[in-house]
């Protein structure tokens, strides 16, 4: 297992994420609210989040929120899927929101250009103000931080939360907004108290040649992020992600004794 000096990299879990999330909550979420205000003025009733990899998973989680607590039409679509199979309805009552950390994802930029050409409101969420994606969108937010899962989730969540608040208030939405304010403290606690346990689990998992990740509901996108983005991209571990309700319908038949099956199926 790699022994990495966390002070030399910016993509690992560190206490810096606490300050980054605090900054996003205080500075960037209000910017999202400004964009939503414009969406409401334009009678936007359909939102397309377009992204790839981890940002797409964050957008999918926000879509789940919209589906559960509202009748908003919210979609989370991979970049090339949006470009190659462009939704039939793409007009001036739609919003296309592109999410790309480094801001150069070709298909996400193209999706924004398609949306803008059809009259849709377009917005980009990215790390830097000079990223190419910002020139393709009418609105942009450059969050200037590294803990992208938390940031993308907060920004996409904030779009949906604010839209529901303004158009069709739901009792649970206020509770969720209040809970999000506790996120920095919760993250700090997890970083301080779980790192050693995580290291021990990582050492154990490093011996496994393949890992199945099983999840459902709002945790299914997170399951994909961990099972594919983290395990395959970052650690080169073979594996797949399976919806928990489908696990017993076939996949369970090939699970061998001793094979690891991480489960993230609870809310």
Question: Which residues does each PLM region occupy?
Answer:
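Glycine-rich phosphate-binding loops that contact phosphosugars or nucleotide phosphates
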Residues: 42-179, 183, 258, 265-267
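Generic preference for hydrophobic/aromatic residues in regular secondary structure cores
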Residues: 25, 74, 187, 262-263
